[in-house]
Amino acid sequence: MRVSVSKIGTSCAERLLNDVNVWARVRNDPLLTILTAKMPLRKEYRRWFDGIEEDKPAAGADTSSLRIYLYLTKPKRSRGGRRNVHITAVVNGAHAFCLLSRMGAEKSPLGGETFCIRVSKSKLCPTPLEDLPDPRNEPVPSQILPADYTSLTSKAIPPLDPEWCVCLSPGAWWHYPTETVFFFHLKDIMKSICPAGWNSMTFCAILTAFLDPKPRNCDLRRDTRRRHVDQFGNTDGPGAELFCPCKVPCHNEDGPRRTPLRPRGEQNLLKLLFVGHVETVTQLQHACEPGYIPGDVSRVIRGNGADGRRVPPNCQAWDLLKFTQFASRSLLCGCPEMRRIVDDAADSSWLRSGE
């Protein structure tokens, strides 16, 4: 294993580690604790690690990501009585840095061997290349978390400031004041209408499947199999692909975004979306644009029949839910497309103008 010392600075090292929402513990010895996490490979990370290569898991998943292992030991207490932690970080098996940091740690809401940590007041330490541990000897987490993603949600009503959000996809929003994801989810009583084996119950996933033919990956940056990283269980799998609110219908063959779309996908899903047959569907809110969190889906889509008359959406089929702040941050940390939308909107004039 060839490892180089990273040129990362103290503040950037802290930012990298604090960008991770959930760490998985893979070893807990009396004198050593080992944590690991997986996260998307962002542009700024490439600047911190010269020639960084993507993590190549054994399963061969095509995902641009970092696999980080932290080796934690506790030196003697300082004169102030505080007990700092010595951190050796190995990134993608090729880059390393060492810190002496104050660390706050607590069990994550996922349970098991998962933790949320926060490092601060760090100092860079010499990185002894000859004594670096080999992360290839450590296991990769394999438990899929959460077992039931709805355990990280609750029923919601529109917030008092429903316009302070960005639309992530039709029927899903990032609400900035609470830093949470609001989204429409299929009611349990309606699941029997879904085709056999159907397991993605978010509004955006069902609308996309109804509108888009299969297979269709016309926009690779939204190909979730390539882009998602598991920031819940830190496995080598795609993690939150089933319930991440980033799926959007494709418009590349249908003209401008405001153009009504003709359903070309799974027609058995019609009853979940509208109370009658529709020839065209118009999205009233679009990803990356200012949004509004409504109480029902009538402000998300509009349908028209063959005679041009309006067909009401099936508002009774959907509940407005919100993810916990913890789960919302894990989704944000694991989906580069969602991160891009949220960060770009936060920097945009339309959001700042309301401050």
UniProtKB/Swiss-Prot annotation:
Record-level GO cellular component terms: host cell cytoplasm; host cell nucleus; viral tegument
Location in the cell: Virion tegument; Host cytoplasm; Host nucleus
Domain of life of the native organism: Viruses
One Pfam family here: Herpes_UL16
Keywords annotated in UniProt: Host cytoplasm, Host nucleus, Late protein, Virion, Virion tegument
Annotated InterPro entries: Herpes_UL16/UL94
Assembly with partners or alone: Interacts with cytoplasmic envelopment protein 3 and with the capsid.
Function: Plays a critical role in cytoplasmic virus egress. Participates in the final step of tegumentation and envelope acquisition within the host cytoplasm by directly interacting with the capsid. Upon virion binding to target cell, a signaling cascade is triggered to disrupt the interaction with the capsid, thereby preparing capsid uncoating.
Family: Belongs to the herpesviridae cytoplasmic envelopment protein 2 family.
Protein name (database record): Cytoplasmic envelopment protein 2
Species of provenance: Psittacid herpesvirus 1 (isolate Amazon parrot/-/97-0001/1997)
